[in-house]
Amino acid sequence: MSVTAPQAPSCILHDAGTCRSCPHLSVPLPDQLAVKQSRVSSLLAEHVPADLWRSPALSAPERFRNKAKMAVAGTTARPTLGILDGTGHGVDLRSCPLHETAIEEALPVLADLITDLGLRPYDVPTRRGELKHVLVTASPDDDLMVRFVLRSRRHLERLRAALPDLRRSLPQLAVLGVNIQGVHQAVIEGPEEIVLTEEDRLLMRL
């Protein structure tokens, strides 16, 4: 009985040239795997006989990434969550097919929160703004940890006050935190972490 190999996910961001984080997306997964297997076996040929290699296993082609590190850009009214282009401006990747469904469904809610609270995205070229990143982690139970990376403590109490409303909009929220990263560097997180919920960790069942 033949087994149909999983195909690479369809991604409108890749097709439009908006995002090139997955440069081999147009190559069929079995072909990608064959190339990788060939390279590895060639590198280890002196140490591993060819007959000892087992057939490689294909992983899930999409919905396998349980953590999203989203750079925030754009404006308060129209924030982008994703990456920055070569000029430091935002490219929205909320529809990235690699993220688990719980994360993809949470990102629009968090974007609305940014607008509702007036959190100004940090603009790299001008070095102005407060909100640098939104980090979202999903557990196997679809519970979420959300962390806002801010330039300062300026909006800390605003986020704390919004927690009840956010829980209603995002019932799977388990942990909400703020990280302070006040330097103009390509560093996602700073040294100061402030947890706004009673829970301070996400249960990851094995």
Q: Which residue stretches match the model-derived regions?
A:
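Accessory RNA-recognition modules of RNA-modification enzymes
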Residues: 1-206
